[in-house]
Amino acid sequence: MNSQVIIFDTTLRDGEQALQASLSVKQKLQIALSLENAGIDIIEVGFPISSPGDFKSVQTISKNIKNSRICSLARCLNKDIDTAAEAMSSSNTFRIHIFLATSTLHMESKLKKNFDQIIDMAISSVKRALRYTDDVEFSCEDASRTTMDNLCRIVEQLIKAGVKTINIPDTVGYTVPNELSTIIHNLFKRVPNIDQSIISVHCHNDLGMAVGNSISAIQAGARQIEGTINGIGERAGNTALEEVIMAIKVREDILGVSTNIKHKEIYRTSQIISQICNLPIPPNKAIVGSNAFAHSSGIHQDGVLKNRKNYEIMEPSSIGLKEVKLNLTSRSGRAAVKYYMTQMGYKECDYNIDELYTSFLKLADKKGQVFDYDLEALAFINMQQEESEYFSLSFFSVQSISNGLSTASVKLLCGKKVSIESATTSNGPIDAIYQALNRITNFPITLQKYQLVAKGKGRDALGQVDILVEYKKRKFHGVGLATDIIESSAQAMVNVLNNIWKANQVNEKLKTLKKVNN
């Protein structure tokens, strides 16, 4: 049996379902590029039929990813399959991932079909997908609650039809490891043409066993694991791929398999996705949590100092976790900043050096010395900025008055031409600034979430503000970064206003296209 395990990442499709606000095309591309850089084999980049935005994201990513294989999801509907193929048409090689429920519960209560009809739908859709690519994956939704007889029957027919990858999802995270292992064993035992296809598993974490189930499936013969970085996903999440990958590496003696993953890119990829998705990593998270390599017990600390292997089964450097000693000040030049960015794993194409250096100098003037975590935070904000933002904050001031009230004055540059000023008194400085900015744009928004996170150490640490607003029943996310909390809060709101403005522009273009087509 092949000892290579294919890693299938669905952060951009299944993982995005956990987010309160959709990611922009640029953010999705950043994630896809980081996954490609980490050596991910298959990147499921979206569900193109679901929205024009998802279609555009898949289309854009397909044009830019060269080393990983692109994959899109489709239901057993011709329009889904055709749209998926169209969105990925610029890629030399791509996969179409079709799914259909096979459990009795889903067939009777959701689909209102019998099993013969399910097989006919599945085979018809596979034939449709094979018109576009020879790489077709089929997922038997709710496979872990499908009868073994039915599962074996449909898998055999799918392989005969030309499916190269059969996915066995534990859709609701119901299975336990030995149960999933038995399912995989039975498929290998009872399906005569099973050797003509790769068996994959897609485990959810509702009972906290997604990683354990995935490992047991590997031991039973599965050779593709589906999941997300940091385990993000709806409900309790998906299989955390970084945990499976490192389990395979550390316990190769037991599992006897390997992956194509560049292990030293794991930590950076995890951090990028955490920041872009605005989903903080718990400190005790395996592999990538801030406490994963921390030792507080005196006995443990003494043991680690004598020999790290006493209490560490892997080195921090094995996932790319290393401390970069920075000594940057306002006298440091562009070359020094570029050098340290390279040391931290960034490529020159990842960021705009002119904009990053300008932000660096402003911070260096305030703090004196810039540390690695400062530069990392600045780089993240730099990478989020679009080439041309419609709104930009040119001035703000806040004055606190009696009874907890504050007055804010702002000047907003609109379209790089028109400068508009506004002033408002409200409860607290941040709300006053938000009210003043909203007076200018007149967007009917409601603030739903405000989060402040320190990016660094000490009193002069950078503060990152993440906000979530609702605008016309849609959620929009914004982020700002500064040593001053009020300034970072203002930047976050301007970021939101730009995101809303861009969404409105897209909607206007779609309306125009519909009128032309009609």
Curated annotation (Swiss-Prot):
One MF term in the entry's GO annotations: acetyl-CoA C-acetyltransferase activity
Metabolic or biological pathway: Amino-acid biosynthesis; L-leucine biosynthesis; L-leucine from 3-methyl-2-oxobutanoate: step 1/4
UniProt-annotated location(s): Cytoplasm
Taxonomy, superkingdom: Bacteria
InterPro entries: 2-IPM_HCS-like, 2-isopropylmalate_synth_dimer, AIPM/Hcit_synth_CS, Aldolase_TIM, LeuA/HCS_post-cat, LeuA_allosteric_dom_sf, LeuA_bact_synth, PYR_CT
Cofactor(s) in the UniProt record: Mn(2+)
Entry keyword Metal-binding: yes
EC identifiers of the protein: 2.3.3.13
One cellular-component annotation, GO: cytosol
Record key words, sorted: Amino-acid biosynthesis, Branched-chain amino acid biosynthesis, Cytoplasm, Leucine biosynthesis, Manganese, Metal-binding, Plasmid, Transferase
Keyword Calcium: no
Catalysed reactions, as listed in the record: 3-methyl-2-oxobutanoate + acetyl-CoA + H2O = (2S)-2-isopropylmalate + CoA + H(+)
Domain Pyruvate carboxyltransferase: 5-267
Main location: cytoplasm
Cited SMART domains: LeuA_dimer
Function statement: Catalyzes the condensation of the acetyl group of acetyl-CoA with 3-methyl-2-oxobutanoate (2-ketoisovalerate) to form 3-carboxy-3-hydroxy-4-methylpentanoate (2-isopropylmalate).
Quaternary context: Homodimer.
HAMAP family cross-referenced by the UniProt entry: LeuA_type1 (MF_01025)
Record protein name field: 2-isopropylmalate synthase
Gene, per the UniProt record: leuA
